[in-house]
């Protein structure tokens, strides 16, 4: 009896979560995206970097996989409508950086920013992206 109630509760939660998700569909097209980011720090602007990444609704946070960035962990990802927010923490390879980001998708493009602290310096990374085609 308890097992049947537990299964019923689980199925009810899955149905509820599916209905909530369907009602707040993200306006974003899965596929390969070209992402341009520019880091700004006090007294310094770093030239823009462009990279490509396969982005999906399930994995909607742009991640630059440059050398030294592979120990970064994204957490607290939240989606509200077409806006995705997240936190990121990087280990020693990336200089113990931590930050928070937010981007808003508009179908085949997005814009947003990430604020972070790296080695005691505050940084703002402005990001924009455009879908270039399907993922390989």
Where are these regions (language model features)?
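Central antiparallel beta-sheet cores of small beta-barrel/beta-sandwich binding domains
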Residues: 47-100
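Bacterial N-terminal signal peptides that target proteins for export
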Residues: 1-9
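Tryptophan-anchored aromatic micro-motifs
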Residues: 28-42
């Amino acid at each position: 009896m308890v097992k049947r109630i537990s299964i019923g509760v689980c199925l009810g939660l899955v149905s509820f979560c599916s209905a909530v998700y369907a009602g707040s569909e993200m306006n974003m097209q899965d596929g390969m995206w070209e992402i341009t980011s520019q880091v700004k720090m006090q007294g310094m602007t770093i030239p823009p970097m462009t990279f490509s990444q396969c982005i999906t609704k399930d994995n909607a946070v742009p991640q630059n996989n440059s050398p030294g960035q592979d120990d970064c962990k994204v957490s607290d990802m939240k989606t509200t409508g077409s806006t995705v927010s997240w936190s990121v923490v990087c280990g020693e390879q990336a200089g113990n950086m931590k930050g928070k980001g937010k981007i808003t998708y508009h179908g085949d493009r997005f814009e947003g920013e990430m604020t972070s602290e790296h080695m005691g310096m505050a940084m703002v990374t402005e990001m924009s992206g455009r879908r270039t085609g399907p993922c390989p």
